[in-house]
């Protein structure tokens, strides 16, 4: 296995960072986020929560949403570096389009070899901005495109993207070199309402994307309540599933997670090796 190849478990624990603490997200309503209360740890500090979630799942790659950045605050570089320096791999969503802050990643991040950058649809307004994916790849940073959905619609900034079908946005990112995609129903986040089957919610969209672009690494989540929900998304074509509440509610154990496939992923090319 080459030095750029990472083994990534199917479950990706989620950290929502707000005012220096980990909060529990619910249905994408950021005004209602509160510091996490979890039996895993007495702390809401990022590193302590990350270590506690690792102890519960044995998953060392994390999805980190920097909530304050979406209100215009600067990225929390200190937290990113603290987690990376403790051996975690990070997928970071930090509204990278504001002031072209993605251009500062190399000077701010101390260990970029276990870092992937998420560009979410809600931060993009034009097709021209998709060139950012290419720029990141040229700098050796693997981007992930996040297709954010709410009330059955894709969330974008006002502009031409709001007129495009989800599959068109995904294809545009794919044509710019993206090989990892998040499909996320924000209405389901933090609700633990479960995944019914592959024919509802984001299921049909995931199937459409897999048929069109079979080599995409697809990630989804939202509403996960138990092991069977993780299995449902994996069966629908996902390689990874984002989970927060179910971990804090002790619905997933290390033994559960070990039963799911591990995906070798080449950070150099951005491709899943399965």
Model-derived features: where do they sit?
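Hydrophobic faces of well-ordered beta-strands that scaffold small-molecule active sites
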Residues: 9-18, 62-64, 90-94, 115-119, ...
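Catalytic cores of alpha/beta
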Residues: 89-113, 117, 126-133, 204-240
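Conserved anion-binding
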Residues: 14-37, 103-190
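N-terminal active-site wall of soluble small-molecule enzyme domains
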Residues: 55-109, 202-203
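Charged helix-capping and loop-helix junction motifs
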Residues: 74-80, 159-168, 194-207
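Short catalytic helix/loop segments, enriched in acidic residues and glycine
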Residues: 29-51
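C-terminal helical cap(s) of enzyme catalytic domains, especially alpha/beta-barrels
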Residues: 130-133, 234-274
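Catalytic domains of carbohydrate-active enzymes, especially glycoside hydrolases
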Residues: 50-65, 175-181
């Amino acid at each position: 296995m080459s030095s750029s190849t990472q083994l990534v478990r199917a479950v990706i624990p989620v950290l929502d960072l707000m005012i220096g603490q980990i909060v529990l997200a619910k249905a994408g309503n950021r005004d209602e986020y509160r510091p996490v209360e979890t039996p895993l740890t007495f702390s809401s500090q990022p590193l302590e929560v990350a270590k506690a979630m690792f102890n519960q799942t044995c998953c060392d790659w994390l999805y980190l949403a920097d909530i304050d950045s979406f209100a215009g605050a600067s990225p929390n570089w200190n937290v990113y570096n603290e987690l990376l320096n403790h051996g975690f791999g990070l997928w970071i969503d930090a509204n990278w389009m504001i002031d072209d802050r993605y251009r500062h990643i190399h000077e701010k991040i101390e260990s970029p070899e276990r870092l992937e950058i998420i560009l979410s649809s809600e931060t993009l307004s034009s097709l021209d901005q998709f060139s950012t994916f290419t720029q990141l790849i040229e700098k050796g940073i693997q981007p992930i495109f996040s297709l954010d959905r709410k009330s059955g619609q894709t969330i974008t900034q006002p502009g031409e993207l709001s007129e495009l079908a989800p599959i068109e946005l995904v294809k545009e990112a794919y044509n710019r070199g993206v090989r990892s995609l998040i499909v996320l129903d924000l209405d389901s986040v933090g609700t633990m309402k479960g995944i019914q089957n592959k024919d509802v919610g984001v299921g049909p969209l995931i199937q459409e994307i897999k048929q069109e672009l079979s080599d995409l690494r697809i990630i989804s989540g939202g509403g996960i309540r138990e092991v069977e929900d993780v299995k449902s998304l994996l069966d629908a074509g996902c390689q990874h599933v984002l989970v927060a509440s179910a971990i804090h509610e002790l619905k997933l154990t290390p033994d559960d997670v070990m039963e799911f496939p591990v995906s070798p992923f080449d950070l150099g090319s951005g491709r899943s090796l399965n």
